[in-house]
Amino acid sequence: MIDRYKHQQLRIGPVSPQQISAWANKILPNGEIVGEVTKPYTFHYKTNKPEKDGLFCERISGPIKSGICACGNYRVIGDEKEDPNFCEQCGVEFADSRARRYQMGYIKLTCPVTHVWYLKRLPSYIANLLDKPLKELEGLVYCDFSFARPVAKKPTFLRLRGLFEYEIQSRKYSIPLFFTTQGFDTFRNREISTGASAIREQLADLDLRIIIDRSLVEWKELGEEGSTGNEWEDRKIGRRKDFLVRRIELAKHFIRTNVEPERMVLSLLPVLPPELRPIIQIDGGKPMSSDINELYRRVIYRNNTLTDLLTTSRSTPGELVMCQEKLVQEAVDTLLDNGIRGQPMRDGYNKVYKSFSDVIEGKEGRFRETLLGKRVDYSGRSVIVVGPSLSLHRCGLPREIAIELFQTFLIRGLIRQRVASNIGIAKSKIREKEPIVWEILQEIMRGHPVLLNRAPTLHRLGIQAFQPILVEGRAICLHPLVCKGFNADFDGDQMAVHVPLSLEAQAEARLLMFSHMNLLSPAIGSPISVPTQDMLIGLYVLTIGNRQGVCANRYNPWNRRNYQNETVDHTKYDRTNYRYTKEKEPYFCSSYDALGAYRQKRIHLDTPLWLRWRLDQRIISLREVPIEVQYESLGTYHEIYRPYLIVKSVKKEILCIYIRTTVGHISFYREIEEAIQGFCRAYSYDGT
């Protein structure tokens, strides 16, 4: 149901026949009520005009051309001086042709028909409410057997059948004569019910509150029994308990929405507006029609045939009537959902008819293609790449996309700062991409968030807000920590960018949708912004360092890498020909000096180095034996261990400590340290 003022809600469900007729019926100025489609015709083959009371009737759906009736007369729409406002000859109103997009019609079904969505979809709502097997209900709907309801103290149809089969020969000829008279119909209609009418009677007799109470009592009784020891019986009891829970929830839903269960059986079939099932002409004048038109025609043909059988002849066999009711049911099933749990109906070219369900469901359906996934203004789309220098709440927006998305804001900014005197001059400056344009664009983007969305949007983290910044190239730059929420990676994924326009949308984006405010999963509460893929590989490369330990550069006569001359003349082998060399590992007093040396390309990211560290006794292991001791001329000496180096004085006092590390480790440590300090400052600020 759509609110006519706000248009913010949509509810799909079974509708009463009175509501369908209210949607479709309209009263003409002469008092005639139109809306029922009775003929299976579309356009006349000679005049190429819609047939009266057909699927494209102008009296029901409105004129094809605005203000022009079927006769060709013209009236000005909305002009009160023009009188009357409809044609008395053809009965077509002088209205807007856009009415053919929303004005419905209906088909009055001669026999009730079950809605296939509620019968054959799993779980079957009708089977759940009636607590009967689906196969049994399908046999009843398609007239394979009948539903008996004998009435006490009255002659019954079943008793007469028994007399016909087992009584004496004297009644052998009198009883069949009775079955061909009108009296038989009285007995049959009173005692026997079949088809969708039997389903409707059973649904109408249901008391939903009693169903809830009885199902709850049975569920409790099954729960108190406990395990039987038989695995098959335990599974059977478990399935029955699950069924009772679904039945209770379904009954509560019908009560909560104030929907009567018998509405799942149709007596009036809505007819879509003509513009939603058009007939068009392609090259050569050949008409092409929507499949729904052919399916509607099939329903009308079979429904009219059933009407003729019931009205024109009183001696029509009951089996023939039931067969025709079955055909009407199958035609409506094909219209609503062709091929549901069975073979689909095909046309003469062996092509499957596209039913109403096929039109609205799926990726190319009416909802996802034209209502939910349609193209909107102030939006763009591009490939995402990693932005290693971005903050968590920022994204890189290409200049080409940004200048288009913020063009209206940019024009206003150029005029407001008197750079351009009117819109035309402002647009010309934007086309020429003058430097002042980028400056104003950066100011605009600084106070305007954007929304990034990656399809499919399976949860709320599939669309988040970011602060945009201008970047070069044509790809959207994204922080790798937010990829898990989007279920995205950098192998060619695309994301859409939207600009919130209203103040309410911008406030919602800032307060609820910014990426740094969505660090936890809304479903289970676990961290959603965790390093994955590219970040893990980057951290590994950053901290891997040189795999050679501190002993690698020490003298080892059996290690060929310790010698300069790699080419050895084995004929003149002499160990004295080789000179031992030891690469000097640099010393740094602070991490700033080490990072400065890396920026000056004096050392590499994984170059081992000694970094002076604060005196911390926890670093020193008393049981560890130094690998090497180096003495200086002034009496001081260096004790070299695997992870650290201690400088001691002549009196064996510790002067300073150096740790063995790399520039990658230093950078990683500083990032973590700054993050912890920032968190502590924010926490202390909130606490005060």
Curated annotation (Swiss-Prot):
Which EC numbers characterise this protein's activity in its record?
Answer: 2.7.7.6
Classify the source by domain of life. Answer: Eukaryota
Kindly state which keywords UniProt assigns to this record, in alphabetical order.
Chloroplast, DNA-directed RNA polymerase, Magnesium, Metal-binding, Nucleotidyltransferase, Plastid, Transcription, Transferase, Zinc
Record carries keyword Metal-binding: yes
Subcellular location per UniProt equals: Plastid, Chloroplast
User: What do the Gene Ontology cellular component annotations say?
Assistant: chloroplast; DNA-directed RNA polymerase complex; mitochondrion
Q: Can you cite a GO biological process for this protein?
A: DNA-templated transcription
Catalytic activity reads: RNA(n) + a ribonucleoside 5'-triphosphate = RNA(n+1) + diphosphate
Q: Which residues hold Mg(2+)?
A: D489, D491, D493
Q: How is the cofactor bound?
A: Binds 1 Mg(2+) ion per subunit. Binds 1 Zn(2+) ion per subunit.
- Cofactor(s) in the UniProt record: Mg(2+); Zn(2+)
Quote the record's binding site residues for Zn(2+).
Answer: C69, C71, C87, C90
Q: Which family does it belong to?
A: Belongs to the RNA polymerase beta' chain family. RpoC1 subfamily.
- Which function does this protein serve? DNA-dependent RNA polymerase catalyzes the transcription of DNA into RNA using the four ribonucleoside triphosphates as substrates.
Subunit structure, interactors included:
In plastids the minimal PEP RNA polymerase catalytic core is composed of four subunits: alpha, beta, beta', and beta''. When a (nuclear-encoded) sigma factor is associated with the core the holoenzyme is formed, which can initiate transcription.
This chain belongs to the protein called DNA-directed RNA polymerase subunit beta'
Q: Which organism is it from?
A: Piper cenocladum (Ant piper)
For this protein's source organism, the top of the classification is: Eukaryota, Viridiplantae, Streptophyta, Embryophyta, Tracheophyta
Its encoding gene is what? rpoC1
